[in-house]
Structure formats: C-alpha cells, structure tokens
C-alpha cells in the first residue's frame, strides 16, 4: 500500500500454495488519484479456463489450468520459493496485466554483492530477469539473511528506468 498527497495505491493478490505450486485466484489494483479512479480486478476461473480483467484494462483470455501462471505480486513469492529451494536458474509464467497474455520470464543468479540497508551490510544474491520479448532487464538484490527479502529492484528498459528500494521492515510480532 502506498500513499501521497495526490494518490493512493493498493495491490493485492489472492492465491494458494500447495507443494511449492502457486495457484492464483485474483489480483487487484486500486489506484485513486484525486481526479480519476483507475482500479483493475483480475479473476481466474478454473472451471471455465479463463482469466478476466475488469476496470482500467478490459480483457478475457483462455488459459491452461495445468500451467502455473503468476501475477506480478505472487511472482515475488515464487522467486523466493525457488531461491530457498536452491535453484539458480528458473522461469516463471507471468501474467501481463495490461493484455492478459502470459509471458515466460527467465531468471538466473549472476553473483553476490553487498547491499547496505539501515546501516547494516547484507550479502545479497543478485538475480537477473530476462524478458525475451522486449528490451528490459531487471536486477534483484535479495538478502538470504532476511529470509530472502527483496532489498532493491532495478528495472531498465528503452522506455523507462525504475529503482525500488526497501525503506522499512515491519514486524508483526
């Protein structure tokens, strides 16, 4: 959840994990700039073998129920599961929320680096994501000492560059 004076944003994913396999049920985005509502809801229908989006992006696509398809939020959970399991190279079928198409994303551990968070140095796994259909590259800094938490994500492409960094670790007791 993120807020500022002009907008608030909430992203949610409802899913199940069974023996390391994620099954997405729904993905929700709530973006509320003061002047426009840009919500989007995505629902997986396992009986009808369809994924449907309503709201900002409207589409409906058929899918193979035997294929693990992940949304952008639970893909991070799957990355952690794979790294904890010792995988250094893997792929994830990622749902493109704008179109409903499913794109295979390839991941590979490329090394280690020290990342400083809250004045503490953490040895991080450097994980590189490759998307073969576009000119984007994403580098993840993941700290095994923090239960494989994402500390920094750098996404570079021809149209935009983004860096996300962890600001605070919350404790729920």
Language model feature labels by segment:
Residues 36-82:
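Hydrophobic, well-structured mid-protein blocks that either form specific transmembrane helices
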């Amino acid at each position: 959840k993120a807020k500022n004076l002009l907008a608030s944003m909430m992203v949610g994913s409802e899913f199940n994990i069974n023996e390391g396999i994620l099954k997405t049920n729904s993905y929700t985005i709530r973006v509320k700039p003061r002047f426009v509502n840009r919500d989007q809801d995505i629902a997986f229908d396992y009986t009808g073998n369809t994924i449907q989006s309503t709201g900002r992006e409207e589409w409906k696509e058929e899918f193979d129920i035997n294929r693990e398809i992940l949304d952008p939020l639970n893909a991070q959970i799957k990355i952690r599961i794979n790294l904890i399991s010792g995988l250094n190279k893997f792929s994830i079928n990622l749902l493109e929320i704008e179109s409903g198409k499913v794109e295979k994303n390839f991941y590979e551990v490329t090394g280690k680096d020290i990342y400083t968070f809250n004045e503490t140095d953490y040895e991080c796994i450097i994980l590189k994501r490759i998307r073969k259909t576009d000119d984007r590259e994403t580098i993840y800094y993941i700290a095994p000492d923090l239960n494989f938490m994402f500390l920094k994500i750098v996404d570079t492409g021809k149209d935009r560059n983004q860096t996300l960094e962890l600001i605070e670790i919350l404790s729920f007791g």
